[in-house]
Amino acid sequence: MKHDSTIVRLDSIDAYNKLYGLETKHPLVTVIDLTEATKIVNHVRMDYDVYALFLKNGANCTLKYGRQPYDYQEGTVVSFSPGQLIGVDTDVDEIAPDVIGIMFHPDLLHRTPLASKIKDYSFFDYSQREALHQSADERRIFNQCLERIKEEIAHPVDKHTAEIVSSQIQVLLDYVTRFYERQFITRGKVKSDILSRFESSLKKYFESDRTKEGLPTVNYFAEEAHLTAGYFGDMIKKETGVTAQEIISRHIVDRAKRRLSESADDISIVAYELGFQHPQHFSRMFKRITGISPTQFREKHSSGR
């Protein structure tokens, strides 16, 4: 049966706690245990202005990002960041789902080391089919991190609170990063298939007329793989040791080398054929990767024949 969804803006920690009937102990951060919820929340869309991570222990909850369901099975972690709209739908109204997690407002991070680092945790931008599937040991560590944060915010707020809590959150986020890297490794065949498709799609892009539309982007290949750019890029880097963008750039330079060696076309023509709008951008990329300019490469190649 289809239900209409109400949109709820989560612009504060208290807004979330009131939604579920939970107590707010700190205005900028909360450790969540939905088994303590006193209100039913179902068929709603939450407009996030906060960061959140949730670990699902039970089975009866479906989350949606856009129209797509999250890969949110028992024992998985999902993460959200400001600007995301997340739907909550269950088959039955459940007053206290077995879900734990943490939610914190960006203001908590002001003047802390985490403020400048938060953007590096790319899993906040992961989408459907990209949840973290935790082992029993990883779940235990996740719980321990939450308990430490919970203990700290139970104390009266003082000048040290934000620094201590943000550092504990950073430890949790670092663990989640480690767990995702483990997941990339254990999902080896999936990862290998994605890399193979990426390499194949990259070749096809330059063998077609797509270069008339411009240079290929990481986002283009991520969409082909039905992944977010963040998850796709992290998986490719874990597999190859270099970024997806660097693989694209190296492929472009390899093709440029062949064109410069096989033809006498002006360098600007070669650049346009490869998808560059400005030849100087091509020359800059070429020199960064090879150490010499396209002109120097052509001269060196010619003198060696």
Task: Mark where each language-model region is.
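A hydrophobic/aromatic-rich effector-binding and dimerization subdomain
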Residues: 91-155
